[in-house]
């Protein structure tokens, strides 16, 4: 650890930069940790290949001996350009090769990329993940993916699973109320709508 940051936290930060396509910043970030146990365990050449040339990396015969970080990074990088293909690859080829947390993180990333283009499969991808590994933006896109399908049970579940600081946003409170109303919970729905509108009330 450095400053109380674990290797898992550092891995996740690297993956978030891959997901955001901040590849140059990622390399600089890793170099800053060269003197740590985490940094020394990383093969910078392999990491570069995984994120800059994921197809070549995934076809490499030596890949089977590499760490979970490189495989997850390569698939995450590919998902930026072709989320559908990566979804198939995870399900058909890599499920047993990824750690559970990395697999869940990847499904959230694939769901997010699918959501951005209004792919109707986005919700299914998100459902294979876990809210605990999702960023705020991914949690919000999971709700949008459910709204796209008008799946009100999924809307309610997704808004309830949001982080506390996200779920109280007026927009998500409103949609949680809509989902409750669709299931016949009109009293609860009205309470949510009152919360959603309260900042605009006469009394502030």
What is each residue range found by the language model?
Residues 1-204:
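Extracytoplasmic and endomembrane cell-envelope/extracellular-matrix remodeling and assembly machinery
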């Amino acid at each position: 650890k450095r400053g109380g940051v674990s290797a898992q936290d550092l891995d996740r930060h690297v993956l978030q930069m891959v997901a955001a396509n901040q590849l140059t910043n990622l390399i600089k970030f890793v170099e800053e940790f060269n003197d740590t146990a985490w940094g020394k365990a990383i093969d910078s050449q392999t990491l570069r290949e995984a994120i800059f040339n994921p197809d070549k990396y995934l076809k490499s015969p030596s890949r089977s001996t590499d760490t979970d970080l490189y495989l997850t990074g390569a698939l995450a990088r590919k998902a930026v350009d072709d989320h559908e293909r990566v979804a198939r690859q995870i399900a058909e080829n890599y499920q047993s090769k990824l750690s559970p947390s990395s697999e869940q993180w990847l499904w959230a990333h694939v769901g997010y990329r699918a959501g951005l283009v209004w792919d109707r499969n986005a919700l299914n991808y998100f459902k294979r993940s876990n809210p605990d590994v999702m960023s705020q933006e991914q949690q919000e896109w999971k709700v949008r993916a459910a709204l796209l399908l008008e799946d009100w049970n999924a809307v309610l579940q997704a808004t309830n699973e949001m982080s506390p600081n996200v779920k109280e946003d007026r927009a998500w409170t409103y949609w949680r109320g809509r989902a409750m109303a669709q299931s016949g919970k009109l009293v609860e729905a009205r309470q949510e709508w009152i919360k959603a509108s309260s900042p605009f009330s006469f009394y502030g």
